Amino acid sequence: MSSEKRLIAVFGASGNQGGGVVRALSQGGRFRIRALTRDPAGYEGAADEVVFADLERPETLAAALEGAYGVFLVTNFWQVGTDEIRQAGAAVQAAKAAGVQHLIWSTLPDVEAISGGEFKVPQFTGKAKVDSIVKQAGFARHTFVIPPAYYQNFVGPYGPQTQPDGSLGWTLPIDPKVRCLHMGDIGELGDIVAGAFAHPDETGDGAYLPLVGDFMSFNDLVDIFVGLGHKVTFTQVPREAYAGFFPGADALGETLAYYQTYTYLGPGSHDARIALANKVAGKTPTPFAVWARDRLRLAATPSV
């Protein structure tokens, strides 16, 4: 029937990004939603149907995408053994073969290209290299969304740590005065994705839609925490010294150096893209001060 709702298949439906997409699509009511997950029995979200799909097993993708009008695709760099270009390439190929009309890919800036090879941030660049695969696939519509530096991480794994005097603080190799962090509540990315599917004429020609709730420095973050009654400090250390602090510190230092030099989203103005993202989402993302006021619960040992 012509009145039947179009079907959107959502990869990573149990995760931060995919879960938010399912919620936003469900609240909008324009589409049927198929959650794609490696654990259908454990899925507890708002999707209309749940189907097994594993990006490590391309043979599972044809059935998972059958009948879908749209696909939201996201990969997880931090999952051990993940090859994002291979996974996303297989999913794009399967989506095209299934007749998908609109594919939305969750990407990040190409740090390698932006910095001329100065900085290596594979969790960004690997996703960016999938963009050309999406563009060349020949979908009727394709869109790119750009997740921010998650607010959640700044009170979790990348939040202030316990200092020798018992207070909380950051000790990092970045100038705390430099405003370079494009941040946001990752739960709100779904509003942009749902809006992009609902307004393909505005977004489906390869638009890049970043979620940006705030643009901040670490000093800005400290000021907000202190204003909420928390004793939080920031200490800048040389990158060379920081590299020996813990396994993976060198890679985090590289990422922070990129931020300080080029910002999270890269150089230049991003105002037009942010404005379009907010327009199709139908709302302005939550600023960090408001998010922190409503949700901030600092602990001595942040949890992931």
Model-inferred region functions:
Residues 2-46, 53-66, 73-86, 93-102, ...:
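Oxidoreductase cofactor-interface core, primarily capturing Rossmann-like NAD(P)-dependent enzymes
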Residues 40, 88, 97, 264-266, ...:
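Intrinsically disordered, low-complexity segments enriched in small/polar residues
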Residues 91, 130, 136, 272-279:
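Short, charged low-complexity linear motifs
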Residues 204, 239-304:
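A hydrophobic C-terminal alpha-helical subdomain
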